[in-house]
Amino acid sequence: MNLFRKWVFFSFFLVLVPIANAQSPVFAGVAPSMEAGIGYSYLNVDVPSQTRIAMNGVDATFSINFQRRFGIKFDLGYDRAFNVFDTNYHADLLTYMAGPVFYPIRRRKFSVYTQLLLGGARQTGVNFDASGATSTGWVNRLAWAAGGGVQYRLTSSFSVRLGADYMRTWFFNSNNAIEGQNNVRSAVSLVYTFGERREHD
């Protein structure tokens, strides 16, 4: 079972457990809702044995909010950089993660959220070996992200979301050994909400 299949299994598990618990009475004003978002992402990537590089791309999310303060989020991101270290090679990072999202502040017009996502990341890129020669390759390993942000409602269905995360991924260093990366991601997204939520200030 490869990493992607494990992520799919984990994602279904995250959905099924809250649904099973949802058989208890639902209180007025906390009806479940779903959100789909897509937007621009900026990723500052730590390349082992080298300096950091900037990637730009797209981030797509799907959230199921089972309660007023709690939900599950699925996150799929793709970011890319061109002519990395002036080598004419590109680098990209594909992430696929899921996990819980919490809303410490949730109002009719805006909300504040925190999240912890777990899944995988496949990075393709370039590095230099000990002799200074160019080395290219890819790594697909476990990844996780932790962060938060704010979401402002424009209409009853559309919102704007601003978020930032610390992201942990992996890539090879100058000795061709796999090493952890400390990355920072920020994103701005347009979000569409399915279902009504009667929030009060």
Task: Report residues per predicted region.
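Gram-negative (and chloroplast) outer-membrane scaffold detector with strong preference
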Residues: 23-24, 61-132, 141-144, 152, ...
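Predominantly the C-terminal beta-signal and adjacent terminal strand-loop region
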Residues: 152-201
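Extracellular loop and loop/strand-boundary signature of outer-membrane beta-barrel proteins
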Residues: 45-48, 83-88, 130-136, 172-178
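Transmembrane beta-barrel strands of outer-membrane/channel proteins
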Residues: 34-42, 74-78, 114-120, 150, ...
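Short glycine/proline- and aromatic-enriched beta-strand/turn motifs that initiate or cap beta-hairpins
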Residues: 22-66, 72, 185-201
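Bacterial N-terminal signal peptides
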Residues: 8-18
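Membrane-spanning beta-strand positions in outer-membrane beta-barrel proteins
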Residues: 35, 71, 109-111, 149, ...
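Bacterial N-terminal signal peptides that target proteins for export
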Residues: 1-9
